């Protein structure tokens, strides 16, 4: 959530930033809502002061046995109470109106984020390795998996409908191996703390991560009102919800391997074959909670951690800086890592690392105290995929395929596969 005080002081900057995201000016409307709320709050506070004064005068009147004066002040107190009863409800309405308006606005892009309408305006930052080449026509992952008889979309459809996959045998073990390998790298070598989190969360947690109210249609909700997580970012970030941290505790770095659940409401007709875009998939997530001064340094570090996973798997990839038109709602700057898929003949996103500034910290009321200071500051948060396990499985299948349809297992995964070196039918 954006800071209304900052908006009051910098209305032009807000509208300029929103224009980069293709959003109409909002500063005038927000300032008007805030002025109305603050004006009403001032009236409420004035009434409360008058009530307190009148209450004291009741006691003073009774002390000198002036019943008539005491009754007059009692009547004044009752009149003020009636006003406050409705005024408090109106204050709540005005506050909610302002908060709803602020909650609907995305974060402000950093100055060095490239301006653009969509993904076509993203900028390539760097490449790792060159696209894998073959002396045969490479197959896509779904053909490879089905030919191995270890990837079953028909049975998955009977079980759950479209956009689900059943893996079996060595492919199921390979998926598990990838997740364990990624988590081990982040925990034992990159300094993240492993966390096992709930897969069901409350409204407040989804709101704190800035997925509500805007993205409700992209999520699955249970009959009791809880939400299935679309990413472990939601519970990991909310570990500091409503907490006050000491600066000496920061940065906090969390990592988790979880299933993720997405409705893919806006993806009709896209990636309908295979397991590239699923309702349920595994992902390793990284989350950092830090200070304003360290957040951009942490973004570079987090991105390098995600890249390191792909380098160890020897998978060709490129890192992109997302344009203002393609960046996520809560992000101030985002790096996307795209892995090469020979079967498709293109790069596809496998990780996204974002710095959110205090956007989520403000929603969560998560703050920290600098040494020797009484003033509290909202934490800065970052999140990144480290990486999407299913998409990494796709990348391994397509980049390590052989002419006979078998799959060579990357060296770093073989210990997780009990020494298996090749997957065959």
From Swiss-Prot:
What Pfam families does the record point to?
Answer: Seryl_tRNA_N, tRNA-synt_2b
Compartments, as annotated in UniProt: Cytoplasm
Q: Name one GO biological process term.
A: selenocysteine biosynthetic process
Its EC number is: 6.1.1.11
- Give the catalysed reaction(s), semicolon-separated: tRNA(Ser) + L-serine + ATP = L-seryl-tRNA(Ser) + AMP + diphosphate + H(+); tRNA(Sec) + L-serine + ATP = L-seryl-tRNA(Sec) + AMP + diphosphate + H(+)
For this record, the Gene Ontology CC terms, alphabetical, are: cytoplasm
Q: Which UniProt keywords apply?
A: Aminoacyl-tRNA synthetase, ATP-binding, Cytoplasm, Ligase, Nucleotide-binding, Protein biosynthesis
Q: Name one GO molecular function term.
A: ATP binding
Report if keyword Nucleotide-binding is assigned: yes
The domain-related comment in the record is: Consists of two distinct domains, a catalytic core and a N-terminal extension that is involved in tRNA binding.
NCBIfam families noted in UniProt: serS
Task: Report the function annotation for this chain.
Answer: Catalyzes the attachment of serine to tRNA(Ser). Is also able to aminoacylate tRNA(Sec) with serine, to form the misacylated tRNA L-seryl-tRNA(Sec), which will be further converted into selenocysteinyl-tRNA(Sec).
Q: What is this protein called?
A: Serine--tRNA ligase
Q: Which organism is it from?
A: Bartonella henselae (strain ATCC 49882 / DSM 28221 / CCUG 30454 / Houston 1) (Rochalimaea henselae)
Its taxonomic path starts at:
Bacteria, Pseudomonadati, Pseudomonadota, Alphaproteobacteria, Hyphomicrobiales
């Amino acid at each position: 959530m954006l800071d209304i005080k900052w908006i009051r002081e910098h209305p032009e900057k807000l509208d300029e930033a929103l224009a980069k995201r293709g959003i109409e000016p909002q500063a005038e409307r927000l300032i008007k809502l805030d002025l109305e709320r603050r004006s009403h709050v001032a009236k409420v506070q004035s009434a409360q002061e008058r009530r307190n004064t009148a209450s004291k005068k009741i006691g003073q009147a009774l002390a000198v046995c002036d019943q008539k004066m005491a009754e007059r002040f009692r009547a004044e107190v009752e009149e003020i109470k009636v006003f406050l009863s409705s005024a408090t409800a109106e204050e709540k309405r005005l506050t909610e109106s302002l908060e709803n308006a602020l909650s609907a606005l995305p974060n402000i892009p950093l100055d060095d984020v490239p301006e653009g309408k969509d993904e076509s305006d993203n900028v390539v930052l760097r490449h790792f390795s060159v696209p894998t080449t073959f002396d045969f026509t490479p197959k896509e992952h779904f053909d490879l998996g089905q030919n191995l008889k270890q990837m079953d979309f028909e049975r998955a459809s009977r079980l759950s409908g479209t956009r689900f996959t059943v893996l079996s045998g060595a492919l199921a073990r390979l998926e598990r191996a990838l997740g364990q390998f990624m988590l081990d790298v982040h925990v034992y070598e990159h300094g993240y703390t492993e966390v096992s989190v709930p897969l069901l969360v409350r409204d407040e947690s989804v709101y704190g991560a800035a997925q509500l109210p805007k993205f409700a249609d992209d999520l699955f909700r249970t009959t009791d009102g809880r939400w299935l997580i679309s990413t472990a970012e939601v519970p990991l970030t909310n570990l500091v919800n409503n907490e006050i941290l000491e600066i000496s505790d920061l940065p906090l770095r969390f990592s988790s391997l979880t299933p993720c659940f997405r409705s893919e409401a806006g993806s009709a007709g896209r990636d309908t074959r295979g397991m590239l875009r699923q309702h349920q998939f595994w992902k390793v997530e990284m989350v950092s909670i830090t200070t304003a001064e360290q957040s951009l340094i942490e973004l570079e570090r987090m991105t390098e951690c995600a890249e390191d996973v792909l380098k160890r798997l020897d998978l060709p990839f490129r890192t992109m800086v997302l344009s203002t038109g393609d960046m996520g709602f809560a992000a101030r700057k985002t790096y996307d890592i795209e892995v090469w898929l020979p079967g498709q003949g293109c790069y596809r996103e496998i990780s996204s690392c974002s710095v959110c500034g205090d956007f989520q910290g403000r929603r969560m009321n998560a703050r920290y105290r600098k040494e020797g200071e009484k003033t509290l500051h909202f934490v800065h948060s970052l999140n990144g995929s480290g990486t999407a396990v299913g998409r990494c499985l796709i990348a391994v299948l397509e980049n390590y395929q052989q002419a006979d349809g078998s799959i060579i297992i990357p060296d770093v995964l073989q210990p997780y596969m009990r020494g298996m070196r090749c997957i065959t039918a």
